Amino acid sequence: SKSSAYVVQLAAFSNSDKAKQLQQKLTASGIRAYTEVLKTADGEKTRVRAGPYESRDAAEKALDRMKALGMDGVVTSR
């Protein structure tokens, strides 16, 4: 398996400020996070992802931490 192959996708916002707020909340909690802009039929959306992680297990553990902080997400391969 490739290294850094997994991320946790948290949300996609049409409001990029909301995406930035979530990213900052994650970063403040010690979770590495980043945003990506997606072009969709409904216009641009800003996706918030945490990671990358080297294994699905590491990503799942990080997701457990996010859930404890009141956030939710899904583990996906990059």
Regions found by a protein language model. Give the residues of each.
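Compositionally biased, proline/threonine/alanine/serine-rich low-complexity intrinsically disordered stretches
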Residues: 1-7, 11, 17-18
